[in-house]
Amino acid sequence: MSYEKHSDAKASRYAWNQPWNPFEVTLSDPTYPMNLEEKNQIPYRFQSVPDDVPEVPHIESRYKNLPGNNIYLCCGRLQMSSQYKAFLISLFALILPGVLFFIFSAFWLWHHVSPAVPITFAYLYALAVVSMFKCSTADPGILPRNAYSLTYNPAHPWSVIPEDRKVLVGSTRSDSVFVNTVYCHTCHLYRPPRASHCHLCDNCVEYLDHHCIWLNTCIGRRNYRYYFIFLLSVVLSALYLTGLGFYTSIGSFHESTDTNFAAHLRRPWAGVSFFLGIYGALGAILPGILFCYQCYLISVGQNVHEYLRAKSTETEDVHPFHDSIWLNFLVVLCRPKNVSYVRPTRKSYV
């Protein structure tokens, strides 16, 4: 904002050369002391928009035209596979013990042990539920299709046959190797290293570990950390539930007047707590095995897909993506989460 001077002094076109008094000014042209040429150089965003400016066409998100077996919700922010029956079973198996615990066991533990006990279980249980939904609804790293379509040329019939391409892995290391990139005839692209095509989702996924039917999604680069946290929180919650369930049923028996433990289990809170102890012990077996298996694969620099389909498992060659154990965990679990390839609507991303 500029001002106009009310004195007889010779005015200069530059504000810093004007000997003006702040008490002798009035509001004037906001572009003063600019001349006409300088006014025309004002950025367009500060000028008034004329009525005849054409509208920018709407750019649709890529997920709307992606021919895969995925269901998208909330403008592509939530997505999962179309085979959701096993996911409903796993969701019910996770919700049931939590509801029973807070109805029958949490009250006795709150008043007879400590309020911190049910609060700790609530934190672990909430972490398991949130990580489950985050893992199952996040984009695992689906690669956009038709990135390299092969066109048939009658003069060169072999033009539709993809050529092998190699990518140098670990270029700054002395043990760097070349890794072959496979051409996907379904998605029409050269898959990056460690990417694979999922036949259930019908998409190429970056860093595909495996397709989990119980979470109804592929476990890839963008949701692997949520899958790891889900396994860890489920194991801790199940083991914690086992101890709390047995402690509640046995502790309430010693404080009651019942002489028979079998008769004491007929009481609702005692019987349900004993059931939760057995339920937690059985429920910790499979997630515990998967968690230990994932820790082993991370430590050796592989994933499930690479481990099961390795062609040179009997050789002594070091895996090209293997580094130290701590660095492997750091790369897999703490690497930045890149932008989804199929959801963005910005023009810079499309």
UniProtKB/Swiss-Prot annotation:
One of its GO terms (biological process) is protein targeting to membrane. The chain crosses the membrane at residues 87-107, 113-133, 226-246, 271-291. It is an enzyme of class 2 (transferase). PROSITE patterns: DHHC. GO terms for cellular component: endoplasmic reticulum; endoplasmic reticulum membrane; endoplasmic reticulum palmitoyltransferase complex; Golgi apparatus; Golgi cisterna membrane. It is found in: Endoplasmic reticulum membrane; Golgi apparatus, Golgi stack membrane. GO terms for molecular function: protein-cysteine S-palmitoyltransferase activity. InterPro entries: Palmitoyltrfase_DHHC (IPR001594), PFA4/ZDH16/20/ERF2-like (IPR039859). The keyword Transmembrane helix applies. Disruption phenotype: Abolishes palmitoylation of ras1 during vegetative growth. Delays mitotic entry. The erf2-erf4 complex is a palmitoyltransferase with a major role in driving sexual development. Palmitoylates ras1. Palmitoylates isp3. Palmitoylates rho3. The DHHC domain is required for palmitoyltransferase activity. PANTHER family: PALMITOYLTRANSFERASE APP, ZINC FINGER DHHC DOMAIN CONTAINING PROTEIN. This is Palmitoyltransferase erf2. The gene is erf2.
